[in-house]
Each structure stands twice: as C-alpha cells, then as structure tokens.
From Swiss-Prot:
Residues with Pyrrolidone carboxylic acid modification: 1
Tissue expression pattern: Expressed by the skin dorsal glands.
Major site of localization recorded for this protein: secreted
Keywords tagged on the record: Amidation, Amphibian defense peptide, Hypotensive agent, Pyrrolidone carboxylic acid, Secreted, Sulfation
Modification type Phenylalanine amide: residues: 11
Subcellular location: Secreted
Function summary: Hypotensive neuropeptide.
Family that this chain belongs to: Belongs to the gastrin/cholecystokinin family.
GO cellular component terms given for this protein: extracellular region
Protein modification: Isoform 2.1Y4 differs from isoform 2.1 in not being sulfated.
Biological process according to GO: defense response; regulation of blood pressure
Modification sites for Sulfotyrosine: 4
The species this protein was found in: Ranoidea citropa
Protein name: Caerulein-2.1/2.1Y4
C-alpha cells in the first residue's frame, strides 16, 4: 500500500 510519499508529495 501507499505511504506518505506517493499520496502526499508536499515537501
């Protein structure tokens, strides 16, 4: 499953 990278690229 997805983590905090592919689902939230807001760095």
């Amino acid at each position: 499953q997805q983590d905090y990278t592919g689902a939230h690229m807001d760095f």
